[in-house]
Amino acid sequence: MFLVNNIRCSNMAEFPYTTVPGKIKPFFQKIQEAGLPSKVTQKWINSIGFTSSNDPSIIPLLKKLGFIDRSGVPTELWARYRDKDLAPKVMAEAIKNAYKELFETYPDAYRKDKEALRNFFASQTGKAENTIEKMIQTFKALCELADFESNSEEYPHNEVVPSREGLTTLMEKQTPKGLTINVNIQLQLPATTDEEVYDKLFRSLKRNLLSE
């Protein structure tokens, strides 16, 4: 009986959540306002005003969404989210990747009510009711920051793997005649604390590579 239960638990899915879902919106606003950190730590989170004992639970959420890597270093996704025009689409992309199984079950998961989400998370994770509630609140709060309705090809993007020396991005552009062009860009970022340098860099990439 013990072995059966152990196997069942190992097959349970994991979905991102934070114990402070009400902090999600103001935190992602800070991403756009604060400078680009070299590493996201509890100390850095405290420095931008998130000093509650539960606020560090945002860090695992950022990892699940792909905004930081395993060591806490901001990824290219973080840099793209700093552009307020791109942010809603970037968030939608991150949510779909983090909640892949949910969107496979419900392609319009962002429209589902709490009861449908509760049934899904409960059946997939086997977690306690209070944890399920945090999952629902987290998902709903993230979806409020996302744009799932715009043309998905407006800002096409493939999976990104951060490198130690800079940011590596793979962009895909669809030409009017249907020809797909893949552009692999490896950026050696300058050692600077001036976030404007990064902002200008990604604005230039957007203008020159993603324009019609």
Swiss-Prot record:
| Domain of life from the UniProt record | Archaea
What is the designated name of this protein?
A: Uncharacterized protein AF_1681
Species? Archaeoglobus fulgidus (strain ATCC 49558 / DSM 4304 / JCM 9628 / NBRC 100126 / VC-16)
Q: What is the lineage of its organism?
A: Archaea, Methanobacteriati, Methanobacteriota, Archaeoglobi, Archaeoglobales
